[in-house]
Every structure is written in C-alpha cells, then in structure tokens.
C-alpha cells in the first residue's frame, strides 16, 4: 500500500482470508468456494491484475492468465500443482503478457 499497490490475494480457507485481510490485503478470495479469476475481474472493474505472483503453477497458470490485465506480468516462484501447464500462446501475444519466474535462490556476482 505504501507504493499505491492494491493487493488481492487468494487463500484456501476462510481463516486464511481473514488473516490476509488483517495483514493489509485489499481483498482476499477463498479459491475453494469462489471462482477467483471472476472475482479478480470484478474487483478490478474488468481490467484484471497488473501483476500475478504465482506460487501454485500447473493447472492454475491458465486461470491466472485469464485474470491478468492486458500488458500484465505473471511471475512464477513455485510449482506446487506441477511444473507443466497448457496455455494459448496466441492469447499471450495478443494481450502482450509477460511471463517470467524465479527460484528465489541467490546468484553469484559473476552471474
């Protein structure tokens, strides 16, 4: 919030939703009881999220991309649901999406 970022999070339980809101999330969605992609679209007035930090991977990738704004950035940092996903590359190109990732491990200065 300090930088003007509105953080929308997804959680697997109502208790985690409450905790995320207590920690300062602008909105929290229980992905077990709601269609998180539709909720993100609704919360952003149909625009979608500018950045998605994905710790799930696998079959969640297409759903994450569906709630990403045009020119949005998807950042993968874990693969709890698997390391492979099917996606429509034409959609990625048409909407000018950026897909990137990190293992969050340190690198040498020479890298």
Regions found by a protein language model. Name each.
Residues 3, 11, 20, 59-111:
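Glycine-rich phosphate-binding loop and adjacent beta-alpha segment
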